[in-house]
From Swiss-Prot:
Binds to actin filaments in muscle and non-muscle cells. Plays a central role, in association with the troponin complex, in the calcium dependent regulation of vertebrate striated muscle contraction. Smooth muscle contraction is regulated by interaction with caldesmon. In non-muscle cells is implicated in stabilizing cytoskeleton actin filaments. This is Tropomyosin beta chain. It is found in: Cytoplasm, Cytoskeleton. Residues 22-40, 51-66 have a biased composition (Basic and acidic residues). It comes from Gallus gallus. PANTHER family: TROPOMYOSIN (PTHR19269). Residues 22-66 are annotated as: Disordered.
Length: 284
């Protein structure tokens, strides 16, 4: 830009010099015309006064001829100076137009630079928001993973308790069968001895009480198994929900990664455009 201004100043100086030369040529032309007019008047006077003196007439004719040649040269110089002035005016106009275009390109580049800076700021803010969201999602995912581990642990514990209760029920059923067998043996001996019948009856009552006790325990175990089954079902439901949440979070993370990649590509394109604009400014 500074070089263009210096070039314009030099062109303006050349224009002023050309104008001065043109004015000087005009002055020479006028002087030559005046001299020519004066010589013509003198020639006419001499022709009237010295008609017989051909040498003098020829001398003055040569002077007139020289004056006319000088006049033609002055006219030619004036014409050349005017042409040079016109050429300089055209060059100045072209330089001014080039300067206007350069200023327009500079303004456009500055505007693009400002827009690129704004876009970069917006992209940076967007990336910070995305990073915060990703961080929150990671924390949420970690919490849900802990809940999933806890649910799996509860389910495993419920399975273990269920197996333990099932084993106890098998043992109780075996004891009940053995008690029933003993009761049958006692009943078979009932017809032989009344005394043994009483003993057997008492034993039977004791066995019945024990059977009732076992029945109460069995009901209790069944109720506990039912509760454990409900807890297991609830744990399985929580595990399924946690798995769905993890899948949803994985999809959200994938979407966020895609969005971050798109923002990076957009920022890269803006940077390239900004570099091109700066190169255009530098080339000016």
């Amino acid at each position: 830009m500074e070089a263009i201004k210096k070039k314009m100043q030099m062109l303006k100086l050349d224009k002023e010099n050309a104008i001065d030369r043109a004015e000087q040529a005009e002055a020479d032309k006028k002087q030559a015309e005046d001299r020519c007019k004066q010589l013509e008047e003198e020639q006419q006077g001499l022709q009237k006064k010295l008609k017989g003196t051909e040498d003098e007439v020829e001398k003055y004719s040569e002077s007139v001829k020289e004056a006319q040649e000088k006049l033609e040269q002055a006219e030619k110089k004036a014409t050349d100076a005017e042409a040079e002035v016109a050429s300089l005016n055209r060059r100045i106009q072209l330089v001014e137009e080039e300067l206007d275009r350069a200023q327009e390109r500079l303004a456009t580049a500055l505007q693009k630079l400002e827009e690129a800076e704004k876009a970069a700021d917006e992209s940076e803010r967007g990336m910070k928001v995305i990073e915060n969201r990703a961080m929150k999602d990671e924390e949420k995912m970690e919490l849900q993973e802990m809940q999933l581990k806890e649910a799996k642990h509860i389910a495993e514990e419920a399975d273990r308790k269920y197996e333990e209760v099932a084993r106890k029920l098998v043992v109780l059923e075996g004891e009940l069968e053995r008690s029933e067998e003993r009761a049958e043996v006692a009943e078979s001996k009932c017809g032989d001895l009344e005394e043994e019948l009483k003993i057997v009856t008492n034993n039977l009552k004791s066995l019945e009480a024990q059977a009732d006790k076992y029945s109460t325990k069995e009901d209790k175990y069944e109720e506990e198994i039912k509760l454990l089954g409900e807890k297991l079902k609830e744990a399985e439901t929580r595990a399924e929900f946690a798995e769905r949440s993890v899948a949803k979070l994985e999809k959200t993370i994938d979407d966020l990664e895609d969005e971050v990649y798109a923002q990076k590509m957009k920022y890269k394109a803006i940077s390239e455009e900004l570099d091109n604009a700066l190169n255009d400014i530098t080339s000016l």
